[in-house]
Amino acid sequence: MTGVAAPERIARAVRADIRALTAYPVADAAGCIKLDAMECPYELPAEVRDDIARAARETPLNRYPAAANPALQAQVRQAFEVPAQAGLLFGNGSDELIHLIIQACCEPGDTVLSPWPSFVYFDMAARLSHARFVGVPLTAGLELDLPATLAAIEAHQPKVVFLALPNNPTGGLWPDAAVRAILDAAPGLVVLDEAYQPFAGHTWMPRIMDEPNAVVMRTVSKIGLAGLRFGYLAGHPAWIAEFDKVRPPYNMDVLSQAVLAAVLRHKPVLDAQADRLRADRQPLADGLAALPGVTVFPSAGNFVLARFCGKLDGNAVHLALKTRKILVRNFSNAHPLLADCLRISVGTPTENAAVLSALQDILSA
């Protein structure tokens, strides 16, 4: 029996816009200094890992996870200072939460808006849901263009506005007054993405119950738990109840919940790691700025964005680092405003010294 060739069958079954995409690339990091994904470079201490192992042993795997986990919710509220009156929703990282928000709010053709460039998944999740994504360009200095953003909100009437605070990949933290103006202008929901909040020393979380059209979204990925895939959304219970309706059943597996509960009993360890990375950010930025032909942008995250405009452009520098087994994220071709830009995660002092030494050799050759 002969059938239709697989490519033809795929063309009939899979959406054209999906076939035009490429899968999210993840570089092979074996044997490399990994400074490309804003991960915490420090492994958890032995006593924390022991508690994780104990929690995993005691977790029944033959049952589905409970629809709600009041004990874990209480831990998250205490650990991350979520207001007692706020609704709380868990997701598999912030990626799933972005999907849930757009699915709940947007019909095909509705607008999702964000300053741009920013977190790429705002755009992707909107398009996957047949929403229209509007990215409002940042200034040439990669700052928020507030007049343009307010004009775009007025023109496009977005159902959802995403604000990354601080912004990824630029590192900028938009002023409170600008965020306030966007909150006042937005006709729908404003999502305050605080993925990098532990490194910024600034949050909207204590004020979230005063904002009728906003929610705060966070992840634990940047503070040492990237492998766990856990994010949470906080805001008025009425918003959270709507997003909960589109949450997949049993979306948070029992092991992730058990591991998070074990780790949160050691929250000071996570805080200390974040504080260390925050302290090491400026020396890394200063070292980059001292290199010939390098411009460094201010960052409130656990990374630094640098533009290479000397003898070698961003693509060439990225390749040269890769040959030296040092991975950083190349944004040179991602957006015109990011031409020749590389994003470098803050690593351990040894890793930071290694990338600076390698760049010194590369740029002086």
Curated annotation (Swiss-Prot):
Protein name (record): Histidinol-phosphate aminotransferase 2
Biological process, per Gene Ontology: L-histidine biosynthetic process
InterPro entries, per the entry: Aminotransferase_I/II_large, HisP_aminotrans, PyrdxlP-dep_Trfase, PyrdxlP-dep_Trfase_major, PyrdxlP-dep_Trfase_small
Designated gene of the protein: hisC2
Chain positions with N6-(pyridoxal phosphate)lysine modification: 222
Keyword Transcription regulation recorded: no
Keyword Amino-acid biosynthesis in annotation: yes
Catalytic activity: L-histidinol phosphate + 2-oxoglutarate = 3-(imidazol-4-yl)-2-oxopropyl phosphate + L-glutamate
SUPFAM superfamilies, per the entry: PLP-dependent transferases
